Amino acid sequence: MHNCGLLGKTLGHSFSKAFFENYFSENNITAVYSNFEISEIKEIESVFEQKISGLNVTIPYKELVIPFLDELSEEARQIGAVNVIQFKNGKKIGHNTDAYGFHQSIKPFLTNLHERALLLGTGGASKAVEFVFESIGLDVIHISRNPSGNKQYSYMDLNEHIRRF
């Protein structure tokens, strides 16, 4: 039996458990999907001690989980965020499927007329979105609660940047 789950801080709002339980049932897959709520990243070791096949990772651990992993896929390394952990041959391998999913979703709407993207947020998922935009040649501007770098602005600055956009 496969033991899979979602790793995050507050998971009551997540539909992942119900989605995967339904998927497993409809497809006759012998697996369990559990929510693994941890209040601090250091508690992850207790999750890893369980016999797990794979984990989805959500807020706020997509970046914080990386030091606890044995390997990263190339894309996860480039993005700097992990949303899937694969347990294989005794190793914990971090992957990022957010970038692929976002790229597949937005691809039909992009044209060569698009030059810039306004990205709200600077967390793990937004890093994957930024990776996609930059890989297709778009200039990315971030709006964040805590702007801390080049091309990062506060939500208070948003009106000014929208006018220039």
Regions found by a protein language model. Give the residues of each.
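Short, Lys/Arg-enriched, disordered terminal segments
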Residues: 1-2, 160
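Residues at the starts of beta-strands that form the adenosine-phosphate
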Residues: 3, 32, 116, 138-141
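Glycine-rich adenosine-cofactor-binding loop
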Residues: 8, 94-99, 106, 114-136, ...
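Short amphipathic alpha-helical segments and helix-helix/interface helices
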Residues: 21, 45, 130, 159-162
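NAD(P)-binding Rossmann-fold cofactor-contacting core
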Residues: 136-153
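Rossmann-like adenosine-cofactor binding region
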Residues: 150-165
